[in-house]
Amino acid sequence: MEELQGYLEKGESRQQHFLYPLLFQEYIYALAHDYSLNSSIFYEPMEIFGYDNKSSLALVKRLIIRIYQQNSLISSVNDSNQNRLLWHNHFFYSHFYSQMISESFGILVEIPFSLRLVSYFEEIEISKYXNLRSIHSIFPFLEDKLSHLNYVSDILIPHPIHMEILVQILQCWIQDVPFLHFLQFFLREYHNWNSLLITQKKSIYVFSKENKRLFRLLYNSYAFECEFLFXFIRXQSYYLRXISYGTFLERTHFYGKIEHLQIEHFIFIVVCRNYFHRTLWLFKDSFMHYVRYEGKAILASKGTGTPLLMKKWKYLFFHFWQYYFHFWSQPYRIHISPLSKHSFYFLGYLSSLLRNFLAVRNQMLDNSFLTDTIIKKLDTTVPVILLIGSLSKAKFCTVSGHPISKPIWADLPDSDILDQFGRICKNLSHYHSGSSKKRDLYRIKYILRLSCARTLARKHKSTVRTFLRRLGSGLLEEFFTEEEQVLSLIFPKTTPFILHGSHRERIWYLDIIRINDLVNYS
């Protein structure tokens, strides 16, 4: 990264990064190759039909030239069996190196964002900003804020249909025209390759296991675009009143695309070029909070009385996605519910607002009286059924939760098998440490323990009872009880997982910066 930063700083300004020449540098594909090998949470080596995992710059250059050619590989395929066999070999040959280009695109697109992030923290003089990235830091925020709110909107952010929209969003950040031009070519060809996987069962497996770093970054830029305009409308609705206003955004391309925007429930906003002819004061709410992670978001509001304000924002999102990103969104993607009666799923937890009624005796001179007090607390529990479904998809158990062996790991050494199962147990134990009912994890622990024993028994052609008797009842136990001393902004982790009373204690690990794959049920 230092070498890349040195290259970019040779220009006159950091605002004019030329990323296209970096596509022809050997070390870019070495970085992409190393990242793709080390990024999977489940160590399952992937082989692409005889091709090794070594990248070649010459072959990548040939693939780039082929993408630019008018007669692409896909258009030259006919229905003859011989040509279909040739296409099959060339397809996976091209797929492997297209995956390398995809990873390289992801690395290069991250450069401008990472440089801005580093420069930002240098300006505000924050040296250790890595601890600020913990996704568990969201839950103390929710505990502090949601206890005073009444309604929450559970939002499932839709995926854009056209890749061209994602490239257009990147134009606000990257001014390298050749790089963006080639990115459009690549995404178009990638979409064509992906569309041919319907009848190739084996091909679907390969694509399902590959690392989509570039597409995650494109999706995050799209989510940032949504949040940028949402935050603008939210800010203007809070500060502005019933008068007309002029231009508020520099991003004029948003308003040039539509003439008017009509929202149901007494909201009508006319957008004509750069002017608001109608104010947003009906959206005013001083108690509103928005939190997003990956493809899900929550919008919480005080919402006194009826949830009319939440419905207004709901229809605003629908029309915003329709007119700005040109795709329809289904109503089920935004679900509004009162916090006192319903729970919402977010970041691998089922969260709800508990209300405890207490009677407090007050003494005033010679008189005493009782006062009813309501104490609200955010309760976070582990969704066991959803977690079992995730384990079922990963082939650790059946849909009903019956443990099964992991055949793909049966060829590994015993130490590696124990390490793989132990790593998953440790991740789940640490991630769900903030649950108010840790006893729900005992069933997950049972499934992983039996699945590990069945995998070892399958490898050695023995019985599960034999291995459980040999390894004892402490199989994988150390991975649930082990605690590491990790740098934290608030406190070190010292409380074991299953000590007496620890099932009631909630611990938020501030070193978790990435959601566990088994937690991301979607």
UniProtKB/Swiss-Prot annotation:
Usually encoded in the trnK tRNA gene intron. Probably assists in splicing its own and other chloroplast group II introns. Its main location: plastid. GO terms for biological process: mRNA processing; RNA splicing; tRNA processing. Keywords: Chloroplast, mRNA processing, Plastid, RNA-binding, tRNA processing. Pfam families: Intron_maturas2, MatK_N. InterPro entries: Domain_X, Maturase_MatK, Maturase_MatK_N. One of its GO terms (molecular function) is RNA binding. One of its GO terms (cellular component) is chloroplast. It comes from the Eukaryota. It is found in: Plastid, Chloroplast. The gene is matK. Belongs to the intron maturase 2 family. MatK subfamily. This is Maturase K. It comes from Dianella ensifolia. The keyword Chloroplast applies.
